[in-house]
Structure formats: structure tokens, C-alpha cells
């Protein structure tokens, strides 16, 4: 696809695959709104006061139908928005088209190359001569990463004239990041520094991006305040757990039509995502094995009736492999060579480094047979047997299906709206330093409460005597910060 920004008749910039899908996207957005009571409640509560008036928000988060409802909630509250996806396969093109036509600048399409992906990220951050965004909604931390790497390069350039060398790294994706920064130095050697100075803060959606933020906080390089949305209970214990429980089997069946019942499935990692995946596979009739490094998570798995073994113990016996760790080098090419014919290998962690795709792609004589988009059979020459890899080792639930359903994403995205409001409303107060924060418990409980009515749930009310007896306010919060749900 030619990397040229287009404009709507109203002058809004965009780059999507097919604007003719906008009407279809609008119909699905309207369906999703009914399933997203938290976001709709935000529009009702905050819309009249327009709290985001004057705010420029950049989003780097999967451009799906559910995200479209988030974007239109931000614009309904007064924000200007520019958006890109945080994964090359996760965009739903009809959602991107509808938002580009009706609401916000969008730069996203399904099946981007890595070069196109980083071009889209750069466009979403580009607010013209006035600098960058005021706020960032990030998922995985790529928008945050680009700004941090850009500022670091600009400081080096100002200090000693050093220009980033893309060949200084073997990582093909990071080479593209350095190339973008190198080119920006030619036209504006303070581009990312000006972005940093304008930024009020970022709210981060997922485990992987949160890890990046805490690493930067620990080494003193975090450039602006950050709110960790992922560790809100109404995000991690719902989106990560119940969302994956729904979307993993959806992706598996759309990609392969395989019958899960009776199969041996291995889930690498038993955190919230792993728990949801293992539950889905078990409920579908698979015999589930878990791999874990953490004895507590391993013990939890055994108490759920799951086997806890090492990958090396069972690699030749497993039919379906799912990585959920957020780590790297979990399934290597030497493991893949030992797998049974047509074993399915997939990842539901954020990045593509859990599965050794580079080792697979460069294995001597290996043959790649594309069955359909994001479903490939790789045949090894020495065994003449193959494995099926989904979404090229990236997020299979969004690459091969449509990701988490609207209701559970409403929980996550309501947290995002509240986090963005918190950062924006406190921008001049000094409340938030260059650190990582978590939303307070009373807001977590508010997000949950906004979703109960849709499910027909009714809360029991504490009397004053009961509340005093357990030392909590009648209206909450009901649990201490250290409580484990």
C-alpha cells in the first residue's frame, strides 16, 4: 500500500484499507455500544461538561469495533483523536473506515508490514507544527517507546552530533524505529523533545507495556506520568481472564476448524491470560498441560486439575501449543522440529517473540505453505512433517478472529477513559510525577458497578452497623489495596 495520507471531505487525515466498508463498520459499532455500558455511562456522565475540550489524544491500540466505541467516547467528551493499531494484524478494516469517516484520524489496516506499522504510529503522533499529543492511550508501549527513543537520540545528537545507526541492532523492527528517528533529525532535531514537553501522560492497556513502564521508572528514564490500566482489577481479572477464555477458542476454530475435545493442549504461563486460556481449552474437552516458572501459579494450576510439566517433557505429545507468558524464547525451532505432524502453535501474548519465528523462517530447507491469511503450515525437510503456526506468532485472537467481545472490553476501556480524565484533570496540580500509578480502588469498583445492570445483577447494601463492624464505608471501597480477587 502506498504510504500517502488521505483526507476526508471535511479535511480529516486518514489511511485505511477500504472506506467503502464504513457503513458496515457503523452498524457493528452501534451493536457494540449496547454491549458497552461503562463507556456509554461515561458519555452520559461527562459528555455535557466536555472535560477533554482542547485535549489532543493519540491512541496506539487495536483498531477494532470495540476500540471504535472508545474513540467515540473520547471525542464525545471533547477530545481530538488520532489513532493507529498496536499490532499489524489486529485492525478490523470496517471499524477503521467508520471512524476515519465519522470521528477521528485513523492510520490502520489489517496486514500491515512492519514498515507500514511504524509509519502509522508516526502519523498518529504527528499533530503538525504544534507538537505531539497531550495524552496517549497505549497498548504494548510502542508509541511511548518511539518518543523515548526519539528523545534519547535527539539528546545524543545535540551533545555530540551522533546520528542513530539502524545497523547497530540485529532486531529488524528496532532498525525501523531508528530509521524513523534518523530521518526526523534531518527535518526537526527537537521533534520528540517537543512531544515529551507537551505530554501530560500515558495510560497503558496491557501487561507487556506496563512492564516497559516499570523498567523505565526503575532506571530513571520515564519521561512523563503513566497510569497502569492493566492492573486495575476490572481490567486484568476480566479482559485478560474472561476475554481470553472467549477469544482463544474462537481464533483456533476460525483458523483451523480443529476439534478441541480430546486433544492435548499446552498453555505456557498461568497468569490471568493463561488461566483464561486453560479454562477455555479444558471446557472444550482438551487435556490441558501448563508450563510455569512460578510455584504459586503452578500450584494454582494443579488445584484446577491441570498437569504442570516442562515443554521438553511433552513437546512430542501435544496437539495445541499456546504461549501466554509475555516473555521471549518460549517455543524455539528445536521444539517445533520435535512436534507431531500438524501440531498447532500460537501466541496470545502481546509481542511476537514468544515463538521463535526467526529461527523457523531461517531453518534450512523449511517450506512455508499459506493455508489462508494468518494460518501457515511449515514443513521441515528432515522430518517431512509440518506444524501450523497462527498469525505469524503474533496475537492469534486478533489475527485469526476478532479479539475479546464488547462487554469485557467495556470494562477495560472504561478504565482507560477514567485514567485519561484523571491525567488531564490533574495536569496542573502536580499530583502525578514521572512515575507509574494505578487507579484507586473506588474507581475500580465504580467501573464494575457500571456493568452490573446490563447483567441483571443487584448489589446487597450494607447497613451502617455492618459497615462499621468490618471497618469499611457504606458506599465503599470494600477491599484494601492489597486484596487479591
Swiss-Prot record:
Pfam families: AdoHcyase, AdoHcyase_NAD. Substrate binds at residues 64, 139, 205, 235, 239. It comes from the Eukaryota. One of its GO terms (biological process) is S-adenosylmethionine cycle. The keyword Hydrolase applies. Keywords: Hydrolase, NAD, One-carbon metabolism. This is Adenosylhomocysteinase. The gene is SAHH.
Amino acid at each position: 500500500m502506498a504510504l500517502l495520507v488521505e483526507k476526508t471531505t471535511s479535511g480529516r487525515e486518514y489511511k485505511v484499507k477500504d472506506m467503502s466498508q464504513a457503513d458496515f463498520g457503523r452498524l457493528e459499532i452501534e451493536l457494540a455500544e449496547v454491549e458497552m455500558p461503562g463507556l456509554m455511562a461515561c458519555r452520559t456522565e461527562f459528555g455535557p461538561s466536555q472535560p477533554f475540550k482542547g485535549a489532543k489524544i493519540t491512541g496506539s491500540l487495536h483498531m477494532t469495533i470495540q476500540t471504535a466505541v472508545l474513540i467515540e467516547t473520547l471525542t464525545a467528551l471533547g477530545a481530538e483523536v488520532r489513532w493507529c493499531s498496536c499490532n499489524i494484524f489486529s485492525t478490523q478494516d470496517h471499524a477503521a473506515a467508520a471512524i476515519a469517516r465519522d470521528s477521528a484520524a485513523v492510520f490502520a489496516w489489517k496486514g500491515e508490514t512492519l514498515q507500514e506499522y511504524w509509519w502509522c504510529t508516526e502519523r498518529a503522533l504527528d499533530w503538525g507544527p504544534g507538537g505531539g499529543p497531550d495524552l496517549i492511550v497505549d497498548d504494548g508501549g510502542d508509541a511511548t517507546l518511539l518518543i523515548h527513543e526519539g528523545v534519547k537520540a535527539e539528546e545524543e545528537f545535540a551533545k555530540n552530533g551522533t546520528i542513530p545507526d539502524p545497523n547497530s541492532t540485529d532486531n529488524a523492527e528496532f532498525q525501523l524505529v531508528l530509521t524513523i528517528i534518523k530521518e526526523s533529525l534531518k527535518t526537526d532535531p527537537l521533534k520528540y523533545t517537543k512531544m515529551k514537553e507537551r505530554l501530560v501522560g500515558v495510560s497503558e492497556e496491557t501487561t507487556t507495556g506496563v512492564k516497559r513502564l516499570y523498567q523505565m521508572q526503575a532506571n530513571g528514564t520515564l519521561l512523563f506520568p503513566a497510569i497502569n490500566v492493566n492492573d486495575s482489577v476490572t481490567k486484568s481479572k476480566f479482559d485478560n481472564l474472561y476475554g481470553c477464555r472467549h477469544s482463544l477458542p474462537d481464533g483456533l476454530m476460525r483458523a483451523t476448524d480443529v476439534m478441541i475435545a480430546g486433544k492435548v493442549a499446552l498453555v505456557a504461563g498461568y497468569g490471568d491470560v493463561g488461566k483464561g486460556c486453560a479454562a477455555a481449552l479444558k471446557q472444550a474437552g482438551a487435556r490441558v498441560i501448563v508450563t510455569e516458572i512460578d510455584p504459586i501459579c503452578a500450584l494454582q494450576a494443579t488445584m484446577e486439575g491441570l498437569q504442570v510439566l516442562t515443554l521438553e517433557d511433552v513437546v512430542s505429545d501435544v496437539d495445541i501449543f499456546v504461549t501466554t507468558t509475555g516473555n521471549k524464547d518460549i517455543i524455539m525451532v528445536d521444539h517445533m522440529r520435535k512436534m507431531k505432524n500438524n501440531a498447532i502453535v500460537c501466541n496470545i501474548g502481546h509481542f511476537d517473540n514468544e515463538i521463535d519465528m526467526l529461527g523457523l523462517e531461517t531453518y534450512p530447507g523449511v517450506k512455508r505453505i499459506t493455508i489462508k491469511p494468518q494460518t501457515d503450515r511449515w514443513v521441515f525437510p528432515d522430518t517431512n512433517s509440518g506444524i501450523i503456526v497462527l498469525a505469524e506468532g503474533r496475537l492469534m485472537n486478533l489475527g485469526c478472529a476478532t479479539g475479546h467481545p464488547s462487554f469485557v472490553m467495556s470494562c477495560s476501556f472504561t478504565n482507560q477513559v477514567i485514567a485519561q480524565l484523571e491525567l488531564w484533570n490533574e495536569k496542573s496540580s502536580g499530583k502525578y510525577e514521572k512515575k507509574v500509578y494505578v487507579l484507586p480502588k473506588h474507581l475500580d469498583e465504580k467501573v464494575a458497578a457500571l456493568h452490573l445492570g446490563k447483567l441483571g445483577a443487584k448489589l446487597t447494601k450494607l447497613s451502617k452497623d455492618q459497615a462499621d463492624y468490618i471497618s469499611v464505608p457504606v458506599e465503599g471501597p470494600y477491599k484494601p489495596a492489597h486484596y487479591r480477587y
